[in-house]
């Protein structure tokens, strides 16, 4: 799976799965356009892999759209940006809801729309991978807004695949289990919480960011040219049991 001569836009590229994707795609020859709200992350990516960085707060819809226009026409889009606000159902706040849905769902849809507009104008083709979560399939304590955002993005992935397919644009999603990133540490750092969750995985471990990135690269590649509208669990068998 080589991507020489191709360009990929990656949201949330500064950390976690997004950064792992940036490194892997660059290693395989792609030019990386990295979107992040943290300038230091963009600077380090530029030094490490030569990524072109665009600083943007994806909580701002207008800024998100402007950043995608600035990014220009690309061959691939990876929607990796995501946040979580841990609140119980009874304690959920509008601020938490707006923050999580704004970045995890609304920003992803804006990015898909602008990417698709540019691809259609260029004659079609290309591929998108949205990063969702097993939280969209199973109920986890304090993950109400996060689960809603990820389940919503999976539904959107299927609609995007249907509407963009005639233009030769494939759209898929990956649904990782808990992945060893800073975001996951906020929710799963307590062994009393994480250990019972880990043993529910047939492989008896959580995912590494690089493992999720490899699955994303597979879906973007021509090896998956007949795959669209799919959600690939990267979960060590969690959803199977």
Question: Residues of each region from the PLM?
Answer:
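Short C-terminal tail/terminal secondary-structure segment
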Residues: 138, 217, 228-241
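Short, small/polar-rich loop/turn modules that mediate ligand/substrate recognition or access, typified
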Residues: 165, 170, 227-229
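Substrate-binding pocket helix/loop in short-chain dehydrogenase/reductase
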Residues: 88-89, 93-101, 197
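Active-site helix of classical SDR
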Residues: 112, 149, 157
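Residue(s) in the substrate-gating loop at a strand-loop-helix junction
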Residues: 133
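Active-site loop immediately N-terminal to the catalytic Tyr-X3-Lys motif
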Residues: 90, 138-144, 166, 204, ...
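Conserved glycine-rich cofactor-binding loop
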Residues: 7, 14-15
């Amino acid at each position: 799976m080589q991507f020489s001569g191709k360009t990929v836009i990656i949201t949330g590229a500064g950390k976690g799965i997004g950064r792992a994707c940036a490194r892997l795609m660059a290693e395989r020859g792609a030019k990386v356009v990295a979107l992040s709200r943290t300038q230091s992350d963009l600077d380090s990516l530029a030094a490490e892999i030569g990524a072109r960085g665009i600083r943007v707060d994806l909580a701002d819809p207008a800024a998100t759209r402007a950043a995608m226009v600035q990014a220009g026409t690309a061959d691939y889009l990876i929607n990796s940006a995501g946040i979580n606000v841990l609140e119980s159902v009874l304690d959920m706040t509008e601020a938490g809801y707006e923050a999580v849905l704004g970045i995890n769902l609304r920003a992803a849809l804006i990015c898909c729309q602008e990417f698709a507009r540019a691809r259609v104008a260029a004659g079609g083709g290309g591929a998108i991978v949205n990063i969702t979560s097993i939280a969209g399939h199973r109920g986890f304590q304090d993950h109400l807004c996060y689960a809603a955002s990820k389940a919503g993005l999976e539904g959107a992935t299927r609609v995007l695949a249907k509407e963009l397919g005639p233009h030769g644009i494939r759209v898929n999603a990956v649904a990782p289990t808990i992945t060893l990133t800073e975001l996951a540490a906020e929710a799963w750092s307590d062994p009393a919480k994480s250990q019972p969750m880990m043993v529910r995985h047939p492989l008896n471990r959580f995912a590494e960011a690089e493992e999720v990135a490899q699955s994303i690269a597979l879906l973007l590649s021509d090896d998956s040219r007949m795959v669209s509208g799919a959600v690939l669990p990267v979960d060590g068998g969690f959803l199977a049991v």
